[in-house]
Amino acid sequence: MAIVGSMRQEEIWNTETAQNYDTPGAGMFAPEVLGPTVDRLAELAGDGRALEFAIGTGRVAVPLAERGVPVTGIELSRPMVEQLRTKVDEATIPVVIGDMASATAPGEYALVYLVYNTISNLLTQAEQVACFRNAARHLAPGGRFVIELRVPGLRKLPPGQEAVVWHQEPGYIGLDTYDLLRQHVVSHHLRFDESGQARLFRSPHRYIWPAELDLMGRLAGFELESRHADWIGTEFTAESRSHVSVYRMPPGRTSSR
């Protein structure tokens, strides 16, 4: 899987990717997907401020800010932030350019959140642990860190094979290729236009089991408060394909740096 090591995040999330990222009303921008996400995050933020790691083009941050939640972002990709700026200005949603595992945003927050599998964009366990610790540093006592993440789909992987199709619909195929030794997966997104021309987007990830994620949280001083299969509170079971996990920094406890 040399492809993982050869793909830098700055190169993946470039101007072309940023300009084609939004799919208004469809996919992860569909109201039935985005609505429950924003509802739950607004509930968790309460009257406090929220910080989004990997804010991107503002898919979640913009509607959350429209709910009256003050939102700040951290984002590695300048082109993604440029797309965000076509929707809101810096005064409405300020953004710090930097790595979510280490960059610092000013102030203290009631909520830090990281959605749509994005913690897996960090390709080492050490970086993922650092991301938890960075979230803890930004939180007020009793604050929460929310992660949305897929459950590794290894049960679908045929013995002796490295690839599995995880989604297929007219005009789109999603395919994952696995490196089991390094816990790496490359997601391949093939989109076909009406003429049959294909556009390929690939992104490397380090997949994380829920138990490993919980240990990362404990290393940073968090306690797992809840875990559900989705944003509307469906029970998390052995058959769940993803989870929304809420970690809480207990009052009186400081982050483990």
Regions from the PLM with identified roles:
Residues 129-141:
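A short glycine-rich, Lys/Arg-flanked "PGG" loop and its adjoining helix->strand segment in the class I
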Residues 113-115:
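A conserved beta-strand element that flanks and buttresses the S-adenosyl-L-methionine
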Residues 146-216:
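SAM-dependent methyltransferase
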Residues 104-111:
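A short acidic, Gly/Pro-enriched loop at the edge of an enzyme's catalytic core
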Residues 210-257:
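C-terminal lobe and adjacent flexible extensions of AdoMet/dcAdoMet transferase-like proteins
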Residues 57-102:
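Class I SAM-dependent methyltransferase SAM/SAH-binding core
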Residues 2-56:
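Conserved class I S-adenosyl-L-methionine
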